[in-house]
Amino acid sequence: LGLVHVFCRQDSLLLDTVAGQAEGLVSHLDRYVIREEVTFTDQSDQGQTMLIAGPDAGQTLVSLVQSSIPEDPLGHVEVAFAGHPLSIRRCPTPLDGFWIHGDAISLDALTPLLADDGCREIDETVVEMLRVEAGIPCYGVDLDDQNLPQEVNRDTQAISFTKGCYLGQETVARIDA
């Protein structure tokens, strides 16, 4: 399994990972559901995501969506825009960056406003460069399920050395020692 970000919503959790991982992730997590009332739903094909990054990204978003934006690394907020929900997630890039996820209608309404505010589109090559510069490993490119978090510098984001029992705790503790 690759790195998964978990976002708390009002009545659910959203698990965000790289494309193509939903089936394996659901299968893996489903093994640990015993009595809880849990339903896993693959929403990979629901919505689109764009990245806005740069020194004025936060200020631009605040003015366009008329809402506060996440301050903490990997923080997120859910807002309404053009009558549709948008999820704004702070992403770790060398520049101030935010992932914006929503349906096609809301992103289509947001895109020209971003352009009017001076934002310009960048291609996948630049997004990939930002990812590499930020030291963010990509599952299937830089790592696979044979890598431990410490091997790809995920200690601070993916490991708790103080939390109680969890799967893999012994291996993680040995590497930390």
Locations of the language-model features?
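Basic, glycine/lysine-rich polyanion-binding surfaces/domains
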Residues: 1-177
